[in-house]
Every structure is written in structure tokens, then in C-alpha cells.
A protein has these predicted regions:
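Glycine-rich hexapeptide-repeat left-handed beta-helix
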Residues: 2-22, 26, 60-69, 74-105, ...
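A positional/architectural concept
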Residues: 27, 31-59, 65, 72-73, ...
Length: 218
């Protein structure tokens, strides 16, 4: 893992009453961050992560923000979280717990965050899930192999594995989340996330290589 501090769009957070430490993003060498994206503070980006133009991954208030391997963060996506510490103490209701560790936002492996979507912590998104264009996940957990269709809102609930949220739906009660439809073989978007992950991991590696070539030629 590398501490990347040379680029103006990738830098440490500032100290504040809710965040006593300056932390620099931890970024795998195979991840790619577009120069017009911002990655700030206590953030982990795993292998082959793609961060597209105008995306913001900001671990300066709620933190840490963890992005696992093979995740794509598309154009204008926002990852941010509510204050996770107050006077040096953990705000328990403002974090999600994964394997005994606490996070403002946790994005699992092979998740797609499509254009203009937002995941605002405390929030967890399970592996192989697709979060559609302009969708919002806030104070919620989303299981694995799910699809959040465009412009849907998921707030204050736990979405079970293998469910989809219809486009434009407002899911704000646990009853509504529990009654979401299961993804079947006939569901039109069943294979979408796998295809999107395939494209974006290849783009991350390609742009990373191109970026290295440009620096060598400079």
C-alpha cells in the first residue's frame, strides 16, 4: 500500500474536534484515481479500484471509509459519512461493524457505484451489489448480490441479500426492506454488476498503466 501525498486531489484530512489525527489515503498501487476525482483523509482503496472523474471519497468527518478490491466508483459518486467520533470517543450509532472493526462506510468486493450515486455513512454495501445512477444509501446496510435501481432511496434499513430495489422506490422502513423482491433468473438486471465490474477493473488497470507511461515520458 502507498501513502499518496503528491497529487493535489489526494491528500490528508485536517485535524478537527471530531477527528484528532491527520490521515492520508491508503491506496493500492493497482487502483486508479482520475485527476478530477478527490480522495481525502482516512480512506482505504483496494486492488483495481476505479475512481472516475468528479467522484468524491472523503474520509475527513466520518471515518474510516473502506473500499474493497475491484470496486468501481463512477462519475460524480459521493462516499462520505457522519461524524464517527466526538471528543475522541467512538459514536457507536454512526458506524458499521465488519469483522470487529468500525467504519463510517464499508464497500465490499466487486461493488459498482454508478454515476451520481451516493453512499453516506453509516452505511455498508455487500459484495457484488450494484448501486444505480442517482441512488442514495444512507444509515443503511445493503446485502450482497443486490441491485439498487436508479434514483432509489435506501435509508435506515437493512436490505437482505439477493434483493432489488425498484427504480425511484423509497425504502425507509424495515418492513419495506424485508418485502423487497428477490432477484430471480428472469430479473433483467441480474448480470449487470458482473459486466460493469469486468469493464471497470480493466479500465483501472489500463488507465493506471497509461498514467505511468505519461509520467515516464514527461
Amino acid at each position: 500500500m502507498n501513502n499518496v501525498i503528491a497529487l493535489h486531489n489526494i491528500h490528508a484530512n485536517v485535524r478537527a474536534s471530531f477527528n484528532f489525527e491527520e490521515k492520508t489515503p491508503q491506496i493500492d498501487r493497482t487502483a486508479y484515481i482520475h485527476p478530477l476525482a478527490a480522495v481525502i483523509g482516512n480512506v482505504h482503496l483496494g486492488k483495481r479500484v476505479m475512481v472516475a472523474p468528479a467522484a468524491s471519497v472523503r474520509g475527513d468527518e466520518g471515518q474510516p471509509i473502506w473500499v474493497s478490491d475491484d470496486v468501481n466508483i463512477q462519475d460524480c459518486v459521493v462516499l462520505h459519512a457522519l461524524e464517527t467520533h466526538a471528543n475522541g470517543e467512538l459514536v457507536r450509532e454512526a458506524v458499521v461493524e465488519v469483522d470487529g472493526e468500525f467504519y463510517g462506510v464499508y464497500i465490499s468486493e466487486r461493488v459498482s457505484l454508478a454515476h451520481q450515486s451516493q453512499v453516506h455513512g453509516p452505511a455498508f454495501v455487500g459484495a457484488d451489489t450494484f448501486v444505480g445512477m442517482q441512488a442514495l444509501v444512507f444509515r443503511a446496510t445493503v446485502g450482497k448480490n443486490c441491485v439498487i435501481e436508479p434514483k432509489a432511496l435506501v435509508m435506515g434499513v437493512n436490505v437482505p441479500d439477493n434483493r432489488y430495489v425498484p427504480a425511484g422506490a423509497l425504502i425507509t422502513t424495515q418492513e419495506a426492506a424485508d418485502n423487497l423482491p428477490t432477484i430471480s433468473e428472469a430479473y433483467p438486471l441480474k448480470g449487470l454488476n458482473k459486466a460493469v465490474v469486468h469493464v471497470n477493473t480493466e479500465l483501472a488497470l489500463g488507465y493506471r498503466k497509461q498514467n505511468n507511461v505519461i509520467h515516464l515520458a514527461a
